[in-house]
Amino acid sequence: MTQQYQAVILAAGRGSRLGDRTKEIPKALLPIGPRSLTDRTETTFLRRQSEQLYAAGVKQIVIVVGTLKQQIIDDVKRWDIPVTLVENPTPDMGISGSLHSFQYAVRSPHGILDGRMQTILADADIVYHRDVLKTLLDSPAQSSLLVCHRTSGDNEEVRAYGSESRPRFLGKGLTPALVGGEPCLGEATGIVKFAPQDHVLARDTINWMVGDPDAEEGSLRRRGYSPARMATEHEELTQRFMRYGRMHCVRFGQELPFMECDDAREYARVRESFYPSLLAMEGNPGKQASAAS
C-alpha cells in the first residue's frame, strides 16, 4: 500500500432486523467468535473490522455511533488500537440513514474527506477475509466500489451492474430490464473508497442529498433534495458518483470469503459456519474458501 488511508465505519444504526438481539446491544457489538485461532478472545463485527483496517495500514479510523452508543464507547477503550468516535445525535435513528451518519463524520474536526487521504467508507455489519482489504487498498487511487464477484441470487443483496471501469447501477432486486441489460459485477460489499480528487464533490453531494446544516433554516437546501433526505443511505452517494462517471469497481472472487449480516438467520450462519471457516482459512492460507459457499 503506497497511499495514505483513513476509514469511517458506520455503527450508528439500530439493527432492528435482528430482533431481540439488538434491543440491549448494538448490532456492531454482536459477538462473532474468537479473534483468531490462537487468540480465543471473543471479538465482534466492529472490533474485527477495525483491527483489520489498522493491521492493513489504515491508521485513522473513525467510528460513527448512535444507538446504544455508550456500549461502543466503553468497548473501544479495551482495544489495542486507536480509534476516534463521532456521534450521530439524531433522537430517532429510524429517520437517520447511513449517509446522514457519514455526514456527521465529514463535518467533524477529524479531517474526513478533506483531500489529504484516500477515504474508506464501510458498513459495520460485515465480515470478510483479511486479504479483501488488500484488494481495495492496493487498487488505483480513484474512487471505487468494492464488489464480491460471487452472488447468491438473494434479492436482499445489493448488486452492481456495468463494467469495472464504468459501473452504472447499484441496488437490490434489479432486473435485466431495469439495468438496461448491463452485466452483473457482483455483490457490493458495503465498502467504498473516495479518492482525494473527489472529496469536494462528495461533500457537496452529501449536503445536497441529506441537507446542508449551514443553509438557512427552513430552506430546501437545509432539508435536502434527495427523496429520502436525512434517511438517505450511503449507497445513494455511490450511485450518484456512478452518474458522474467518477466511480470505478474493484472486484475479488469467491476465493476470499465475505458476508454481510442483515438478519437473525444470517447472524446464526456467521456464528455457526461462516466465521469458523474463515478463521480456519486465514490460519491455513492453502485452505479453500468453503466459508463462502
Task: Report residues per predicted region.
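Active-site glycine-centered loops adjacent to acidic/histidine catalytic or metal-binding residues
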Residues: 13, 125, 263
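Conserved beta-loop-beta/alpha segment of the NTase-like Rossmann-fold superfamily
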Residues: 73, 80-164, 280
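N-terminal glycine-rich phosphate-binding loop and ensuing alpha1 helix
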Residues: 2-70
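Conserved core of the sugar-phosphate nucleotidyltransferase
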Residues: 128-220
